[in-house]
Amino acid sequence: MLEHRLSGEQNAGSEDRPIVIATLGTHGDVRPVIALGRGLQQRGHPVRVLTSENFAPLVKANGLAFFPLTGDHQRMLQVNPIRAGQSMWANCRMFRHHIASWARDWPSQGRAACADARLLIGVGSASILVDSLSQALQIPLVYAQLQPLTVSRHLPLVARPQLRLPGPLHVGLQHAMRFGGWQLLREVIDGSVRAPLGLPPYGWRGPDTSTIRVLYGYSEHLCPRPSDWPARIQVCGFWSLPQLQWQPPAALLDFLDAGPPPLYVGFGSMIDADAARLTTTVKAALRLTGQRALLATGWGGLIADQDVDSDQCFALEHAPHDWLFPRVIAAVHHGGAGTCAAALTAGIPSVVVPFGYDQPFWAHCLAQRGVAPPALKRDGLQPEVLAHALRQATSPTMCAAAQALGQRLREEDGVAKAVAQLEQWGLLRDAGIVRQHADVVC
């Protein structure tokens, strides 16, 4: 079947056939994908991004073609804000409910974006759709992930980094958790995605992960590549997308100029079910330390109100991290991969208050590198505890460690390495397009 697709019909004008990158998520999930797409397009490869409608302006502003994929994570988090202490399985059930409603549209949307593609790249929760499209359309694929999902004896669990078991038990637990996650989505994926594409069900064991090539968009300086990963798994460095044409408001510039570099406090795309309580805790901690701070409300992690000392705090909705972080002394955030990357690249320490997902893992990695105190539990967080972490993060020792690590990260080019790896694998040469068996999500 593939041999027919690689005949003269495919080779004629196939250099113009697009690469399709599919992803769903928050800004922290989508911006790295756009950075990777820009890198590919700068090498002469037309790129389409298949993602949710709310990111269409960002995709188009960066010169990439946009195709819609049902799935609005901002709306999902607004409807179901993350409560402090909420269990991982409660989050998973909520996620399954939304996936079930979104996935009905995916086969037709995927065909529209990918039917004439020459390479598919799956990211995050869109990976399993891309695998099915690859099988149905006989198009090569690769996975590009933002957190380490490949099983290893040496990596802590992404969701529970503090839980470590002896080698074989640790690997077994990872497989068991993956199996549980698959069972949660099995009916939805087999029924809503694979059946409309004319594919058989994956089966009770779920997708096979043993042969897929995977690019990881984070730095080995933060999370070293495990020695038990095969060569088909490569860590490239962070994929960072600079903000285009952003002008800071005059009031922000005035605040920055009025005193020593402030702290940044913001939780990005996270929405707190009790944002007022968290905001009160943050302001009380700042009064204890006497430090100046920028309070970024984001999607709803903090609340902007008038009960703020204008000399000590400045409230803003958003500012690009690549512009703002070099101007602050440390960042208090949720621990998303993109925010961690921005803080590290700027050479500033972090204080991490995870909301869930992969955030405890990145908080663990930052603490292991000496550029953040141990993660703080959001549930019951007290001002005194946060104030102590702020003092730790702004200590000369931690600031020096962050500056040294930031220098190493600034010497990396994760996008260039990812593109070079795809070229080395032969996936960007028409002659090298040979579909590998892929029944998976990495």
How would you describe each model-predicted region?
Residues 103-171, 221-222:
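Conserved nucleotide-sugar donor-interacting segment of glycosyltransferase catalytic cores
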Residues 2-65:
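N-terminal subdomain of nucleotide-sugar transferases
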Residues 15, 218, 222-330, 436:
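Donor-nucleotide binding loops and adjacent catalytic segments primarily
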Residues 48-94, 166-171:
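Conserved nucleotide-sugar phosphate-binding/catalytic loop shared by glycosyltransferases and other
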Residues 186-238:
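Long, low-complexity segments enriched in small/aliphatic residues
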Residues 2-5, 116, 379, 383-442:
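C-terminal amphipathic helix plus adjacent low-complexity
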Residues 29, 37, 120-122, 316-364:
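A donor-sugar binding/catalytic signature common to diverse glycosyltransferases
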